Structure formats: C-alpha cells, structure tokens
C-alpha cells in the first residue's frame, strides 16, 4: 500500500485519490485488491519506460552506424574547395580530420576566417599583421 504524508492513496480505477482510513478500516479483500491494482499499475509504467529506453538505444545505434559509415566514404571525405575544412595553405584537398564527417561549405551558415588575426595584448590594441 502506498502511503503519503497527508494520508492519501491513489485509486487506479478512478484516477483520483482516496483517504487511507477507508482502506485501513475496510476489510482485507478491499485492501488486497487496491494493493494488486497499484502494483499492476506500477508494472505497466515500468514496462512502458523499458520499451522507450530500448527504442531510444536502438535508434542511437542505428544513427551511429549511419554517421560512421558516412564519414568513411571516399566521396564525402575529399570535397576540395567545397569543404568546410578547405584552406589553400594547410588543406588544399579539403580532407576531413579523422573521426569527422566532411560537410560541404555553405556561405549562408558558415563563415570562413580571414588571414588577419586580431589580438589584444595588454596596452597594445588593434590589428597585428603576421607575415605569411
């Protein structure tokens, strides 16, 4: 039997609450029936939670397999200047680093950095140009 601080127990049939005194002062059959209903309700809730967890884990496994295979494809690994990893100096082929999937460059959602570096060093402020 599930007791709470304010002496109220949930009635699974009515989706409401009943005072505990009605069950405690009632006969044994009635209290046994309420206990069985509550335990079956809890079992159903646990089964639903387990099913949701199993579906989530299956979905995550499936998506992990899809992303890992997508990153190993030759077509998506080297995109050249169309890659977000493309840089004419250090990555002219536009290859993705190990463990990352290569994504085509989209100027609307991604902005490439310029060669100029901005730094703020104590009293020095402004743009510093480094030799290439």
Swiss-Prot record:
Pfam families: NpwBP. It is found in: Cytoplasm. Keywords: Cytoplasm. Residues 8-20, 27-45 have a biased composition (Basic and acidic residues). One of its GO terms (cellular component) is cytoplasm. Residues 60-70 have a biased composition (Polar residues). Residues 1-103 are annotated as: Disordered. Belongs to the AIM4 family. This is Altered inheritance of mitochondria protein 4.
């Amino acid at each position: 039997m599930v007791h709470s601080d304010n002496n109220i127990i949930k009635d699974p049939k009515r989706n409401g609450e009943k005072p505990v005194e009605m069950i405690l002062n009632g006969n044994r059959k009635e209290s046994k029936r309420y206990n069985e209903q509550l335990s079956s309700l809890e079992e159903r809730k646990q089964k639903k939670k387990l099913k949701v967890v199993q579906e989530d884990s299956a979905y995550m496994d499936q998506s992990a397999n899809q992303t890992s295979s997508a990153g190993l494809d030759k077509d998506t690994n080297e995109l050249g200047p169309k890659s977000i990893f493309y840089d004419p100096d250090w990555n002219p082929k536009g290859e993705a680093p190990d463990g990352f999937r290569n994504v085509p460059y989209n100027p609307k959602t991604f902005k490439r950095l310029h060669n100029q570096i901005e730094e703020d060093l104590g009293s020095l402020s402004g743009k510093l140009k480094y030799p290439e």
